[in-house]
């Protein structure tokens, strides 16, 4: 098994991050939904007031190899606030390339996000998963996550594009 390192993303990683975002969307059967550009990822994640934070998983080259590290996974997270529980971290995306799954890389990304949550004083760590992705649900439960759909019956809603403009009267 190759050596893997989880680290904070750098601005120069945006091309790899976008590639992985597209792979995740394809896996989720939602590839037509990806509208983000590499430039937007740079502007939104690496300015003075970033909208998101990102971790990347990279495979380190074997000793003596000329190739550099290869980004094979990522996790994008940001901070939200719960009026009941306070500071919360939300993992928007987590993805590992298929050929690197089953090596604990996803778990390492999740554990690193948990470390960030504790360092920032967060009381909860939230994420969502499509209802057909049983492998991911099993992983999250094995790591100690609670399924809030089962436990509390929450449904999450989203106003997008035109619905937001209409709601805002614009």
From Swiss-Prot:
Keywords: Acetylation, Acyltransferase, Cytoplasm, Transferase. Transmembrane segments: none annotated. The modification N6-acetyllysine is found at residue 29. Substrate binds at residues 27-28, 92, 152. Its EC number is 2.3.1.-, 2.3.1.57. It comes from the Eukaryota. It catalyses: S-(2-aminoethyl)-L-cysteine + acetyl-CoA = S-(2-acetamidoethyl)-L-cysteine + CoA + H(+); an alkane-alpha,omega-diamine + acetyl-CoA = an N-acetylalkane-alpha,omega-diamine + CoA + H(+). It is an enzyme of class 2 (transferase). One of its GO terms (biological process) is spermine acetylation. Residues 4-168 form the N-acetyltransferase domain. Acetyl-CoA binds at residues 94-96, 102-107, 133-135, 140. Pfam families: Acetyltransf_1. Homodimer. This is Thialysine N-epsilon-acetyltransferase. The gene is SAT2.
């Amino acid at each position: 098994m190759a050596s893997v390192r989880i680290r904070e993303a750098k601005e120069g990683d945006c091309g790899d991050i976008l590639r992985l975002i597209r792979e995740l969307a394809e896996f989720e059967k939602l590839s037509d939904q990806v509208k983000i550009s590499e430039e937007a990822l740079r502007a939104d994640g690496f300015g003075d007031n970033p909208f998101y934070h990102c971790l990347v998983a990279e495979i380190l080259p074997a000793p003596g190899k000329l190739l550099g590290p290869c980004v094979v996974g990522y996790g994008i997270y940001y901070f939200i606030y719960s009026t009941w529980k306070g500071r919360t971290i939300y993992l928007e995306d987590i993805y590992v390339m298929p050929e690197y799954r089953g090596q604990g890389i996803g778990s390492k990304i999740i554990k690193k996000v948990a470390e960030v949550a504790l360092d920032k004083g967060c009381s909860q760590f939230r994420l969502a998963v499509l209802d057909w992705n049983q492998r991911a649900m099993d992983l999250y439960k094995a790591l100690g996550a609670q399924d809030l759909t089962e436990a509390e019956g929450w449904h999450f809603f989203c106003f997008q594009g035109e619905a937001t403009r209409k709601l805002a009267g614009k």
